[in-house]
A protein has these predicted regions:
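Class I S-adenosyl-L-methionine
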Residues: 111-116, 141-145
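Short, amphipathic alpha-helical segments
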Residues: 93, 115, 152-156
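Non-catalytic nucleic-acid substrate-recognition regions in nucleic-acid-modifying enzymes
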Residues: 1-112
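A broad, low-specificity signal marking well-ordered, structured residues that form hydrophobic/aromatic
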Residues: 78, 119, 128
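SAM-dependent Rossmann-like transferase core, predominantly class I methyltransferases
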Residues: 127-169
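A generic local secondary-structure boundary/capping motif
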Residues: 108-110, 119-120, 164-166
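Conserved class I S-adenosyl-L-methionine
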Residues: 171-181
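Short beta-strand micro-motifs enriched in acidic
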Residues: 122-124
Length: 183
């Protein structure tokens, strides 16, 4: 079964809002680093920093390399990054070495400036994780600029979070904004 790693980030004053949104998206108690089999678009949440479509997980880095080698990945113009997280803090040089080390087990060519795809490596609670990386680039962010400085409308981060809570990640639901155009 396919698994996904999610990393959340929030300002301290928005912890409760982030935890509530997390509960409605995943139907679980909040965790800042979370592994699940639910595939949720990273762009729908203001709090999702990143997502990894997991290829392999292992407590031993050498075993992780062997699993990546066994899967026989081949990518042109890929890049391996280390995804920082608040739980584990390997030394910076170690993260560079690990990214370089695992990239030898991926066939293809490396492109550091314009990669496609970006692969992420991270370590959480003594578990090494690698896979495709998705960084949130929310399309709704373009609405962050209010039409006027005196606008009464909700902050876009709050509005997006309320939509996620109300919709519970059900993409088939249609919602109507009763104040549409209030601006």
């Amino acid at each position: 079964m396919k698994q996904y790693f999610y990393l959340f980030n929030y300002p301290p004053e928005e912890y409760d809002l982030c935890a509530l949104e997390f509960k409605y998206l995943f139907h679980e108690e909040y965790q800042q680093c979370f592994i699940t089999n639910k595939d949720i678009d990273v762009n729908i949440s203001v709090f999702m920093k990143g997502k990894i479509d997991i290829w392999a997980i292992s407590s031993n880095f050498d075993d992780l390399k062997e699993e990546v080698k066994r899967q026989n990945h081949n990518h042109q113009d890929f890049k391996v990054i280390y995804l920082k997280n608040p739980i584990s803090h390997p030394d910076y040089q170690e993260t560079l070495d690990k990214c370089k080390d695992i990239s030898w087990f991926i066939a293809g060519s490396v492109n550091m400036s314009k990669p496609k795809p970006t692969l992420a490596l991270t370590k959480v609670n003594d578990l090494w994780i690698i896979g495709y990386y998705h960084h949130g680039v929310p399309s709704w962010k373009k609405y962050d600029d209010k039409p006027n400085t005196f606008s009464n409308s909700l902050d876009i981060r709050l509005a997006r979070t309320l939509i996620n809570i109300a919709g519970e990640n059900d993409q088939t639901k249609t919602m109507i904004d009763p104040c549409c155009g209030m601006g």
